[in-house]
Amino acid sequence: MGKFVIKTQKDGQFYFNLVAGNGQTILKSEAYTTKPAALNGINSVKANAEDDGRYDRKESSNGKPYFNLKAGNGQVIGTSELYESEAGRENGISSVKSNAPGAETEDTTV
């Protein structure tokens, strides 16, 4: 089972990672100014993770596939790592779909 891990950046802003059961980070959030905003972002990932239409499949400037998960309002709520192949990207999306909805939250900022 996956988990969300809330962390702080050096500038004091909050972000979260969705970590799969094997310890691999499969989604990273944008930065948030407050912890409640980051928690709201986690709830948004949980709510949108199972909807394939919320995944924006992209390619980086160096040709590596990745994806963004978007909320209903179109805002990016999480970004994947860069993958070596489109199949790898699809596996990453499947992992978010299966891990996010029931994931616990671990707060490392306390």
Where on the chain are the PLM-derived regions?
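Intrinsic disorder/low-complexity detector
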Residues: 1, 107-110
